[in-house]
């Protein structure tokens, strides 16, 4: 079995890249081969990525080959590109092609108490529900236009789908301030820890471990079935054992 994970919400600053960085670390500690995919040249991540351009389109076999040669492929669909990626995906019947190579699809939707974010997540769920497992992740973010997630039309729709719902903890304000002081944000800090002080690295690791413990609840939807283990791997930076 293989797994394609798509992180999608066409609203800006809703936690997509933070989830990408977290999931990448989660999968890596499982000892699985993975590929990170971006859908726009404007996305800049300080790690190796593959570009599948959502706006201009990409050869369908590119995605199939990536999945076929790698246990897990994580797609960070850029803001404004999720719908383009979806149209290209279904127009080329990639759901059928992935099914032929025994690849499961999981779509992860970041949400917060914001009108636009919730609306976009609901729209993405409507599209992907027919071929993918849906995981909704509540992010600790401020809203531009507040709408309580609990009891919202989006939350009711996710419940009807039977989507898994997770809530990630917030990063401490003092740690966010330290990260911003070196011109980073949370996802970049997760991927470029060498720029952080030891104290901030330690606090960020503690937050990451807590977040990954929550992600473990969705492990059946994230990790390919034949690769699920409870192995313990060493953290390369701190030399600490993280049992996932």
Please report, for each region that a protein language model flagged, where it lies by residue.
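Inter-motif core of Ras-like GTPase G domains
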Residues: 86-114
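NTP-binding/hydrolysis catalytic cores, primarily Walker-type P-loop NTPases
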Residues: 179-244
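Short glycine-/polar-rich loops that comprise or flank the Walker A/P-loop
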Residues: 101-106, 130-133, 163
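Beta-strand-loop-alpha "switch" segments that mediate conformational coupling across diverse proteins
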Residues: 142-207
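Switch II (G3) loop of P-loop NTPases
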Residues: 71-90
């Amino acid at each position: 079995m293989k797994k394609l994970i798509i992180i999608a919400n066409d609203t800006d600053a809703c936690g997509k890249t933070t989830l990408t960085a977290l999931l990448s670390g989660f999968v890596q500690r499982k000892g699985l081969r993975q590929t990170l995919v971006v859908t726009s040249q404007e996305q800049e991540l300080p790690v190796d990525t593959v570009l599948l351009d959502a706006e201009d389109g990409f050869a369908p076999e590119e995605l199939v080959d990536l999945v076929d040669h790698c246990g897990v492929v994580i797609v960070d669909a850029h803001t404004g590109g999720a719908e383009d990626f979806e149209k290209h995906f279904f127009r080329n019947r990639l759901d059928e092609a992935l099914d032929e190579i025994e690849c499961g699809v999981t779509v992860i939707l970041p949400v917060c108490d914001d009108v636009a974010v919730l609306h976009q997540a609901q729209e993405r769920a409507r599209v992907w529900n027919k071929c993918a497992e849906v995981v909704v992740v509540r992010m600790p973010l401020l809203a531009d236009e507040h709408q309580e997630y609990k009891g919202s039309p989006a939350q009711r729709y996710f419940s009807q789908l039977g989507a898994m719902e997770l809530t990630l903890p917030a990063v401490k304000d003092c740690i966010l301030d330290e990260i911003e002081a070196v011109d980073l944000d949370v996802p970049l800090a997760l991927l470029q820890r060498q720029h952080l002080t030891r104290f901030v690295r330690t606090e960020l690791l503690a937050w990451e471990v807590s977040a990954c413990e929550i992600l473990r609840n969705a492990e059946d939807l994230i990790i390919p079935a034949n690769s699920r283990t409870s192995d313990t791997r060493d953290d390369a930076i701190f030399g600490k054992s993280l049992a996932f």
